[in-house]
């Protein structure tokens, strides 16, 4: 769902909604991620520096960044704020949890679970 939001694509569930797990339903009903997907700036995101694991998407009032871990184990992923054309004073929010994600020395760094995507917003 994170990449759907980064691509500003329609959010379509092609499963029986009456039998989905509570976790799946919670994911599909995430107000923050739906708002990101339906942001007024409808341009799709793009990879940062041709890195297929880190994407950036302009929003009407900010920016979204996704970090995707394709590995089979958790790993820390980071991106320089200058690569995102953002000032060092930028602070992020995790779109799934609503928690603040600090930046350090011009970098944003997060632990990403195996085969998962962290979705951050700023602005």
Describe these PLM feature segments.
Residues 65, 92, 115:
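Hydrophobic, well-ordered secondary-structure elements that form the walls
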Residues 1-39:
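Aromatic/acidic polysaccharide-binding cleft in carbohydrate-active enzymes
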Residues 2, 9, 32, 52, ...:
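Structural beta-strand/beta-sheet cores of well-ordered domains, especially the beta-sheet scaffolds
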Residues 24, 30-63:
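Membrane-interfacial catalytic/cofactor-binding modules of polytopic membrane enzymes
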Residues 82-98:
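Solvent-exposed beta-hairpin/edge-strand motifs
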